[in-house]
UniProtKB/Swiss-Prot annotation:
The lineage of its organism: Bacteria, Bacillati, Cyanobacteriota, Cyanophyceae, Synechococcales. Reaction proceeds by a ping-pong mechanism involving intermediate methylation of a conserved cysteine residue. PANTHER family: 23S RRNA METHYLTRANSFERASE, RADICAL SAM CORE DOMAIN-CONTAINING PROTEIN. GO terms for biological process: rRNA base methylation; tRNA methylation. GO terms for molecular function: 4 iron, 4 sulfur cluster binding; metal ion binding; rRNA (adenine(2503)-C2-)-methyltransferase activity; rRNA binding; tRNA (adenine(37)-C2)-methyltransferase activity; tRNA binding. It comes from the Bacteria. Belongs to the radical SAM superfamily. RlmN family. Keywords: 4Fe-4S, Cytoplasm, Disulfide bond, Iron, Iron-sulfur, Metal-binding, Methyltransferase, rRNA processing, S-adenosyl-L-methionine, Transferase, tRNA processing. It comes from Prochlorococcus marinus (strain SARG / CCMP1375 / SS120). This is Probable dual-specificity RNA methyltransferase RlmN. It is found in: Cytoplasm.
Length: 348
């Protein structure tokens, strides 16, 4: 294993054992590395005091590091949601969010710095894409939130900054690590996508290759029930018609055996009319899937409106009358710009 600038987070037990052997140490040293990385959550190699100091120094001199992130700011919302601003090794900023609810802790992780998709209602894409995150940077977000709450996460959702399907291999590598090394069940992990042409079959095939079986949830951010409206909200939809997108969802189901859930942001007087609910039911009714509604969370510089509770309730009841299983996601962390659609890598 080439040692130049290796980040240890994301490496599994066999890879860490191989690293130890490659450096003249025993398999046992690799197991110790694994334990201290994933059970104790160390930030620096020097903190792994069970390893010989000479070997620790040798690893550091060869450019090997844990590969964690540095917390540069923390925002605590009134509902106890915590947003962390985390600095990468090259000085970029990632936002990640911890959402407590009873005995559960959901961590919302980012997969990219910025986003190229340009969704009109989302703050993340306002500055475009800077780069995609590496597996260590994704896994490190989980450790940072775990440390902030002093408790282990129950769920991880890829709903932070970026489009996960434009970073498929690193996202799947991180899911593999979260599952096998941190012990987070795949069924407690959700990957959200706005839809990227030609990636759903690739996701299914690579997920089977990386994970052996696909148990995580794929959530499709639909946000509009027809092509014209969707294109006005999501520029990338111009190259990916809803009909083809839903065909790919069915193909994904055939390949993985896992149903796709649908997400729909409600924008006041724009996509929240009864006829929109009826159109949405027509689109997704055959999937026997869950629809997760999200009331718009305001961002600077946009004139979209959050719908009234009455309009939200009418939309929900319309879907339910059509036999659609639907839920409304609570807007957590709204007062600290930590809610869905509000993350942005610029607030220091």
């Amino acid at each position: 294993m080439e040692s130049h600038k290796i980040q240890l987070l994301g490496l599994d037990l066999s890879q860490l054992e191989r690293l130890a052997l490659d450096h003249g140490e025993s398999l046992y040293r690799g197991r110790q590395l694994h334990q201290w990385l994933y059970q104790k959550g160390v930030d620096n190699l020097d903190d792994i005091t069970v390893l010989p100091k000479a070997w620790r120094n040798s690893l550091i001199q060869k450019g090997i590091s844990v590969g964690g992130l540095v917390e540069v700011n923390r925002f605590i919302a009134g509902d106890r949601t915590i947003k962390l601003l985390l600095s990468t090794g090259d000085g970029e900023i990632i936002e990640t969010v911890g959402i407590p609810s009873g005995n559960r802790l959901t961590i919302c992780v980012s997969s990219q710095i910025g986003c190229p998709m340009g969704c009109q209602f989302c703050a993340t894409g306002k500055d475009g894409l800077k780069r995609s995150l590496k597996v260590n940077e994704i896994v490190a977000q989980v450790f940072a939130v775990k440390k902030a709450f002093n408790r282990s996460p129950s769920n991880v959702v890829f709903m932070g900054m970026g489009e996960p399907l434009l970073n498929i291999e690193e996202v799947l590598s991180s899911i593999c690590c979260l599952n096998k090394d941190l012990g987070i069940g795949q069924r407690r992990i959700t990957v959200s996508t706005v839809g990227v042409k030609n990636t759903l079959p690739q996701l299914a095939e690579l997920a089977l290759q990386f994970l052996g079986s696909v148990q995580f949830t794929l959530a499709l951010s639909l946000h509009a029930p027809n092509q014209k409206l969707r294109e006005s909200l999501i520029p990338s939809a111009q190259n990916y018609p809803i009909k083809l997108l839903l065909e790919d969802c069915r193909h994904y189901l055939d390949l993985t055996g896992r149903r796709v859930s649908f997400e729909y942001i409600l924008l006041g007087h724009l996509n929240d009319h009864i006829e929109h609910a009826e159109e949405l039911a027509d689109l997704v009714g055959g999937f026997q899937s869950h629809v997760n509604l999200i009331a718009y969370n305001p961002i600077d510089g946009e004139s979209f409106q959050r719908p009234s509770n009455q309009r939200v309730n009418i939309f929900i009841k319309t879907l339910q009358k059509r036999g659609i299983v639907v839920s409304l996601r609570a807007s957590r962390g709204l007062d600290k710009n930590a809610a869905c659609g509000q993350l942005r890598s610029m607030n220091m």
